[in-house]
A protein has these predicted regions:
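Sec-dependent bacterial lipoprotein signal peptides
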Residues: 1-27
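Acidic, serine/threonine- and glycine-rich low-complexity intrinsically disordered segments
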Residues: 147-256
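Tryptophan-paired
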Residues: 71-131, 212-298
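Short, low-hydrophobicity acidic/polar segments
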Residues: 87-194
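Sterically constrained small-residue positions within well-ordered secondary structures
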Residues: 35-37, 66, 108, 182, ...
């Protein structure tokens, strides 16, 4: 009788242990770990404040300012050492915030971790990007003009210095130390982009402007590009910037002038900055004048406002056969026609 009772107790205890074990293990199996979310939203705010001759420091309000209106942002995430690109995306969804600034928003799929992030406006016409997938080597540069244009200034530009179009403004955001924590839902990265291109106002007086049909300028000794991830100008090699000029006046005096873009003046440059004006007359003549304006870049007007105001005067003699051809239109209403008046 005792042995029967003892066997029954052992059987009951074993059954209880089995039930308890099943509860424990089934409880563990039904609590899966949550996966980390890779969704990240990038918000890039375009800040155009303080760009001389574009959003401030306008010397001549008769001259249209360069347009800065990005439509697409190219966003890249590099590994934390700045090596390989981990992921990239193109974001085009944009809206205007309460301060009137354009904000781009878009999502990328990237694992939590430490990265370097770069974003710039994609699709500029005259500003190109070289080696976009290298953090330290990605650079913006300007498109070279055709040889037929460059040859007109071959004796006016230092040997080996390419003649390029003025670069379009390129807005860049860089985050060299961006950490994405483990998260669920959407992690948000906010950044701000600014232009790596500068705008200057150039002006010279012309006696006999009515006899001029078109005018172009080439400014040599300028920075040739910008390392966009580092925010550093490229001063070696240098380049010469080519741009068109418009007719206007300064307090009633006839002038030719332009707001032009450049990657800037080389750091510490005190000489070698020359501008050549190439004017075509109504009777088919070509008049070229070159001026050293190194000192103008050191003037208060240039340092504070990016104004290059030459005191010199270019004199254009009347045509030998008056009445042929026509000069500049007396207004700047036909800006679109005049702005690209370069023989190609």
């Amino acid at each position: 009788m005792r042995s029967l009772r003892h066997g029954f107790l052992k059987l009951a205890l074993g059954a209880a242990l089995c039930v308890l074990s099943d509860c424990i293990f089934s409880g563990c199996e039904r609590r899966p770990l949550e996966d980390q979310d890779f969704r990240t939203r990038v918000q890039v705010r375009v800040n155009l404040d303080g760009i001389q001759n574009v959003t401030c420091d306008i010397y001549n309000d008769k001259i249209p300012v360069p347009e800065i209106d990005p439509e697409v942002m190219h966003v890249l995430f590099f590994d934390e050492n700045g090596g390989a690109v981990v992921t990239e995306s193109y974001i085009s969804s944009r809206e205007t915030d309460q301060d009137g600034k354009t904000v781009f928003r878009g999502e990328v799929s990237v694992a939590p971790g430490s990265y370097r992030m770069l974003a710039y406006n994609f699709g500029t016409e005259t500003t190109q990007i070289r080696d976009p997938y290298g953090w330290e080597t990605s650079q913006a540069y300007a498109t070279a003009v055709p040889e037929s244009v460059a040859s007109k200034f071959v004796t006016k530009v230092p040997s080996g210095e390419p003649v390029v179009y003025e670069p379009d403004h390129l807005v860049v955001a860089r985050e060299p130390d961006e950490y994405i924590p483990p998260h669920t839902g959407v992690h948000v990265i906010e950044s701000e982009c600014r232009s790596v291109v500068e705008s200057y106002y150039l002006q010279i007086k012309v006696d006999g402007l009515q006899y001029v049909s078109s005018a172009t300028a080439v400014l040599s000794g300028m920075s040739s590009g910008n390392y966009i991830s580092l925010g550093q100008r490229i001063d070696d090699p240098q380049s010469a910037v080519c741009f068109s000029l418009l007719k206007s006046d300064d307090k009633g005096e006839p002038v030719i002038c332009a707001i032009f873009n450049t990657f800037g003046r080389p750091e510490g440059a005190e000489n070698g900055l020359e501008v050549t004006f190439d004017l075509r007359t109504t009777d088919g003549r070509t008049v070229q004048k070159t001026f050293d304006i190194s000192n103008l870049f050191l003037s208060e007007n240039c340092i504070k406002h990016h104004w290059l105001l030459l005191d010199e005067v270019i004199k254009i003699d009347p045509p030998e056969n008056p009445g042929t051809g026509g000069g500049f239109d007396p207004s700047v209403d036909d800006w679109d026609d005049e702005h690209h008046d370069i023989d190609i």
